[in-house]
Amino acid sequence: MEIERLNALSDNYIFLLYDPAQKIAAVVDPAEPEPVFRRLEALQVDLVAIFNTHHHGDHVGANQALINRYPHLCVYGGKEDRGRIPGQQLFLEEGDRVEFAGRWAEVFFVPGHTRAHIAYYFPPVNPGDYGELFCGDTLFSGGCGRLFEGTPGQMVASLTKLRSLPDQTRVWCAHEYTLNNLKFALTVDPNNAALQQRYREVEKHRAEDLPTIPAILGTEKLTNPFLRWDSPALAMTMDSSEPVQVFARLRGKKDNF
């Protein structure tokens, strides 16, 4: 299974999964149809699935156009998103598994950003390989999504699930927010040497207009404050030893950053 990033809107990524041997493809969170159409035609592959993480327009905006051109494809989304994702046919919940090109993805229910958000995780095939996590707007590189429909407690529970995955997991989040997220992270975790180093690297990448996605989960665990709600440094900064309260205060600060 090959994975490509497709740029969309101002800072979105659509992820194209494809198998050159079987000539089939799937897309994760298609915001716009044209980038997908162009790449499918260039690769000469058939679109068989849309994997949606949640219902927001910048994640499902291309669903209907893709269905119109590829009417046989299957649209996957969360069970709680029934009626909110265009063309949805399969309604997934925690513990479900979905197949693409001989690979099976595990489904995680990760409410917080929305009440129905899900994530897809393809475990590694061989020892030493990376797992692939498609997490929409739940976990960002250096950050996490705003809480539009969920609570801090729900988001901490959701991020705990994702944090428990192996360090050697590639994080395919749906927006290029890394540099701004790390700028914020430095305001709440200024003495974190790993974070300081990562910020310098990301700043250089973005100056050269290079993408920072996928991120690596092991790096996120060391540098992303929204995966470090239980670290002593952040507990001190947020003046709380209660993880959900630490997270809520972090999120409140980020919302106003």
Swiss-Prot record:
SUPFAM superfamilies: Metallo-hydrolase/oxidoreductase (SSF56281). The keyword Hydrolase applies. GO terms for biological process: methylglyoxal catabolic process to D-lactate via S-lactoyl-glutathione. Pfam families: HAGH_C (PF16123), Lactamase_B (PF00753). Keywords: Hydrolase, Metal-binding, Zinc. The keyword rRNA processing does not apply. Its cofactor is Zn(2+). Its EC number is 3.1.2.6. Binds 2 Zn(2+) ions per subunit. GO terms for molecular function: hydroxyacylglutathione hydrolase activity; metal ion binding. Zn(2+) 1 binds at residues 54, 56, 113, 137. Monomer. PANTHER family: HYDROXYACYLGLUTATHIONE HYDROLASE, HYDROXYACYLGLUTATHIONE HYDROLASE GLOB. Belongs to the metallo-beta-lactamase superfamily. Glyoxalase II family. Thiolesterase that catalyzes the hydrolysis of S-D-lactoyl-glutathione to form glutathione and D-lactic acid. This is Hydroxyacylglutathione hydrolase. The lineage of its organism: Bacteria, Bacillati, Cyanobacteriota, Cyanophyceae, Oscillatoriophycideae. The gene is gloB.
